[in-house]
Amino acid sequence: MHNGFDALQLHANRLRGVTIPDLLAAELKRPEQYARQVGPLYFNFARQKYDCVALEALFALARNHNVAGAFQRMFCGEQVNVTEGRAVLHTALRGDLSGTSVAVAAYTAAAKVRERMYALIAGLDASEVTDIISVGIGGSDLGPRLVVDALRPISQGRFRVHFVSNVDGAAMRRTLDMLDPSRTAGILISKTFGTQETLLNGRILYDWLGGSERLYAVSANPERAAHAFDIVPTQVLPIWDWVGGRYSLWSAVGFPIALAIGSQRFEELLAGAAEFDAYALRVPLEENVAVLHGLTAVWNRNFLGCATYAVMAYDQRLALLPAYLQQLVMESLGKRVKCDGTPVDRDTVPVWWGGVGTDVQHSFFQALHQGTNIVPADFIGTIRNDDPYTENHFALNANLLAQIEVLANGQLSDDPHRVYPGGNPSTLILLDALTPQALGGLIAMYEHSVYVQSVIWGINAFDQFGVELGKHLAVQLLPALKGESVEVVDPVTRAVLVRLRG
């Protein structure tokens, strides 16, 4: 059998007419047997459309693809980013697990940079600065933005942090219009310091601040960062090429996080991720939540044929999580060739999307309940909420449970317009409370789930060449928009340029 895929297809065929209620009835201990607790995180896979026999075949697939060995290679600092010849050591930003010289050196370097970062924060604490503008895009923005928004209610930092990512000048103007330049500092975050959006927005911020005195930078090219904006080297924090942008919030890219929530809370975030790292590395495949989550995604994509995947955050503080995961998953797994350059032989990443409950129930849930597509989903909620509005929290979680149940079980009716077909599989994830530790562990779980999927599909989760061509073409077209004579080959682009130039 083809590395276990053929056996799994037989199981998918066997289960085609089986409903999720059928599975619950056949395996009476399923609600407990398909649940896992990892620190402050609870996972329940009981409403996924597989049984224990199919699940064992999924674990066999993981063994056939040596997922455990792949984890070891990544944590030890081997060059698992094969297309760029790089190690992948975001885990070393938050803990030292492998003990190899490469990983220890990475962990030590990251700790030293954090010390520098905290010293810069102490300097800002002693100043009159009240607001921070963080300029970055993609991995330099989505992770910090998510964490700052999620942990704002328990923040220990005294700074208000504002994020600007879009090259659209309206985004920067909206932020600047509400701030006082004399009480504002800026952080420019770019791995290469060649990102068009960050450079253009950075120039606006530089001019608005009246120079670089209160300007900071984070980059894997610190010399270019310092030179481009005349920033003193002591205000430039380094990152490394072994940290991908979408995995970088644990590094100095997290500077705005530490400013917003405080250094202690930032350390708790790292500790939560490190605890999950240790779990992912050491727990056997059959009990490992990251492995099970990744295998479930493969099952839904390749054997149930689901082309989209939804994330429902039933906590307003996690409203940005679907967008963050959209980048993490789709930029990592949106590949059509394997690591060796040959075409993949099955579908890879589905489209990830989602929203925040209960708002989503009044927008796209109609299509989930009565549309024609089966949409697997992760439902994420919190057990304890520290705000005083307890009735609201009860109502929120009642809706969370109700939607999961109806999407899976459906309901028959004599009126065809009122039939709920059900059949939508889901995973429930509950945080004991939305703490830095729990959020760090949750994000780390998704990182490792993505890696599991990449190993099964034989693709590189750590490059992103697909984003390059469009950026390159945009640079070529920019002079044409300004009226310069530029050869434009595409006839539609040529016609639209005439209209854009007026």
Curated annotation (Swiss-Prot):
Chief location: cytoplasm
Q: What Gene Ontology terms for biological process does this UniProt record contain?
A: gluconeogenesis; glucose 6-phosphate metabolic process; glycolytic process
Q: Where does the record place it? A: Cytoplasm
User: Catalytic activity, per the record?
Assistant: alpha-D-glucose 6-phosphate = beta-D-fructose 6-phosphate
Cellular component, GO annotation: cytosol
Q: Which residues are responsible for catalysis? A: E331 (proton donor), H362, K471
Is Acyltransferase one of the keywords?
no
EC main group: isomerase
Disulfide bridge map: none
Q: Which PROSITE patterns match?
A: P_GLUCOSE_ISOMERASE_1, P_GLUCOSE_ISOMERASE_2, P_GLUCOSE_ISOMERASE_3
Q: Which Gene3D superfamilies match?
A: 1.10.1390.10, Glucose-6-phosphate isomerase like protein, domain 1 (3.40.50.10490)
Q: E.C. number, please?
A: 5.3.1.9
* One term of GO molecular function: monosaccharide binding
Metabolic or biological pathway: Carbohydrate biosynthesis; gluconeogenesis; Carbohydrate degradation; glycolysis; D-glyceraldehyde 3-phosphate and glycerone phosphate from D-glucose: step 2/4
CDD domains in alphabetical order: SIS_PGI_1, SIS_PGI_2
* InterPro entries associated with the record: G6P_Isomerase, G6P_Isomerase_C, Phosphoglucose_isomerase_CS, SIS_dom_sf, SIS_PGI_1, SIS_PGI_2
Give the protein family: Belongs to the GPI family.
The job of this chain, per UniProt, is described as: Catalyzes the reversible isomerization of glucose-6-phosphate to fructose-6-phosphate.
From the Swiss-Prot or TrEMBL record, give the protein name.
Glucose-6-phosphate isomerase
The scientific name of the source species is Xylella fastidiosa (strain 9a5c)
